[in-house]
Amino acid sequence: MASTEIMTVNMGPQHPSTHGVLRLVVELDGEIIQKITPHIGYLHRGVEKLSEHRTYHQTIPLTDRLDYLAPMHNNLGYVLAVEKLLGIEVPERAQTIRVILAELTRLKSHLVWVACHALDIGAMTVFIYAFREREMVMSLYEKISGARMTSSYFRVGGLSSDVYDGFEKDVREIVDTFPGHFDTYEGLLTKNTIWLNRTVGNGVISAEDAIDYGITGPALRGSGVDWDLRRDNPYSGYEKYQFKVPVGEKCDTFDRYKVRLVEMREAVNIIRQALDSLKPGPVLADAPQVTYPPKENVYNTIEGLIHHFKIASEGFPVPEGEVYQGVENPKGELGYYIVSDGGNKPYRMRIRPPSFVNLGAIEKMAKGSMIADLVAVIGTLDIVLGEIDR
């Protein structure tokens, strides 16, 4: 009986298909994957520990740098958790704007995913088109927050400021033009023979296994599990919006691709509904002990200046307790577990990053496949190392 020689291959930490500094130790029998061991931590910055030494407001910029392709989702989950501890109500206008920006962020993130996923498999045209469309959302980000990626736009109690004049017009231009671009992507990929050969039947994980591994987001729905936090555990007024939750049937890479394409169309649908319901009003809660005063008060009254200085320098106390808040980030469930001891800083903050959990299932998805197909499996998970390593 011939002996089998197992060959070990290092994929990364500097490899274009890992989309960051991820190292995979792959054991092969010929070209067939037998085992995958992920090595992570190259981008570790200690965000959870850093938050224990910063006030609740000062932690917001740290969240931007988790999934840096979806910063406003990172902000949203964090501020919702703190608001739940404080027991404050966010104004309706602020909630609606949060939903609009969260769904625009979903579009922006999924555009990067389809661009890089297609490029990994050899479809360069889609990469160029998707980044062209993404630039429209990036420009809007810059107009509204002053930054293209690390926006830090959401605040505990609402938003840092109201949207600019012309915001609604810019958003409507995006939602009116994007569906046609989605048709283009599908025309280039969905029935493409090479694309089908690389994705259909590849990276299969059953619904039961997906649940056991704790997978969430499009990767879970691609396995046929009908679960979406926006619908099943709504926040920020998502219960007011009508949208479909797409699910797959064959639990493979192609199904996860189809789920994300439908999600982009549904994001456009949600944004349209939110724009139609956007009404004038305040964008910060009426909670002076937590929120910053209006700029005109800071510049023109000593009371406003002192108020601003106290919150900026000392923060605000949060009642003793603990809370968990999850949001439907483009990659899956992003969760914040915060423990407060009654002070102005988190006693402990634990982040549940979807990419970290989803990456744990990569061996289950890819074992028995060819090593060439591993690139497609990594792409279909849509991982970001910023939130994996934290």
Curated annotation (Swiss-Prot):
Entry keyword annotation includes Protein biosynthesis: no
Which terms in the Gene Ontology molecular function aspect does this entry carry? Answer: NAD binding; NADH:ubiquinone reductase (non-electrogenic) activity; quinone binding
Q: Where does the record place it?
A: Cell inner membrane
**One Pfam family name from the record?**
Complex1_49kDa
Cross-referenced NCBIfam families, in alphabetical order? NuoD, PRK06075.1
- Known function: NDH-1 shuttles electrons from NADH, via FMN and iron-sulfur (Fe-S) centers, to quinones in the respiratory chain. The immediate electron acceptor for the enzyme in this species is believed to be ubiquinone. Couples the redox reaction to proton translocation (for every two electrons transferred, four hydrogen ions are translocated across the cytoplasmic membrane), and thus conserves the redox energy in a proton gradient.
Its protein name is: NADH-quinone oxidoreductase subunit D
Q: Which species does this protein come from?
A: Geobacter metallireducens (strain ATCC 53774 / DSM 7210 / GS-15)
